[in-house]
């Protein structure tokens, strides 16, 4: 809008045809991003808060860990079934796959591509589903998601009372586990730019200590920002 002005047309407005769709979830008139992205990934309508599970899955609030941080799954094993995602189907065909986002990597939209869980806020247990050969790994991903980039490093690294108060209470360093399996690991735009794709086909990039990456306008205004743009990540 700033570029074209009030009388100008955005690209979407200049298309030949437009349409309206109903995006209700299985249990609500207004969906949230968990079942909506899950519907894109699986073709299945599910309840609000649920990620890539069957329609009968009930959203169960996540639990707190030993440090009082909310983010552990409260899902009963009998509560619904996982349904295949596009990433899993692509991996089964031998293709490379990735989840790249400017949100936390465990946030509902990216998480729906690689995890199955009854509540979007169980971020600590969402993260482990992306770690090949680790406890909690989503084995439907074969040898794992090839490229993972976003924010929220706290869900992937151990708790520290001074430097990582929202870190993992189980002590696991998921980034170290990925590095041990051949993943390159980066935390800044400069480190990402230095990665040689020919030598590193698998990568995890976590560009914030916690929470999402900055909005693009804020990032552009901050000359000291070390975060990549979505364009630079893709």
Residue ranges and their predicted role:
Residues 220-222:
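Long, structured protein-protein interaction/assembly regions in large complexes
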Residues 234:
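A glycine- and small/hydrophobic-rich beta-loop-beta segment
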Residues 212-214:
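Membrane-embedded hairpin module used as a gating/binding unit in multi-pass transport
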Residues 1-197, 201-202, 209-210, 224-231:
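N-terminal catalytic scaffold of extracellular/periplasmic and nuclease hydrolases
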């Amino acid at each position: 809008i700033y570029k074209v002005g009030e009388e100008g047309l955005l690209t979407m407005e200049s298309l030949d045809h437009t349409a309206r769709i109903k995006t209700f979830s299985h249990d609500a008139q207004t969906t949230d991003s968990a079942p909506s992205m899950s519907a894109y990934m699986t073709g299945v309508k599910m309840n609000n808060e649920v990620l890539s599970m069957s329609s009968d899955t009930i959203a169960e609030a996540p639990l707190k860990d030993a440090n009082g941080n909310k983010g552990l799954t409260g899902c009963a094993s009998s509560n619904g079934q996982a349904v295949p995602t596009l990433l899993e189907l692509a991996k089964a065909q031998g293709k490379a796959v990735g989840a790249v986002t400017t949100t936390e990597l465990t946030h509902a939209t990216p998480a729906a591509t690689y995890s199955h869980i009854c509540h979007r806020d169980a971020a600590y247990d969402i993260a482990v589903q992306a770690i090949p050969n680790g406890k909690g790994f989503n084995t439907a991903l074969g040898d794992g998601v090839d490229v993972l980039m976003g924010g929220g490093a706290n869900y992937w690294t151990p708790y520290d009372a001074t430097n990582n108060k929202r870190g993992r209470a189980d002590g696991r360093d998921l980034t170290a586990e990925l590095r041990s399996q051949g993943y390159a690991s980066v935390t800044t735009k400069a480190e990402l730019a230095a990665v040689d794709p020919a030598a590193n086909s698998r990568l995890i990039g976590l560009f914030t200590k916690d929470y999402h990456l900055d909005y693009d306008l804020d990032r552009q205004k901050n000359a000291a920002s070390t975060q990549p743009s979505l364009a630079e990540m893709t």
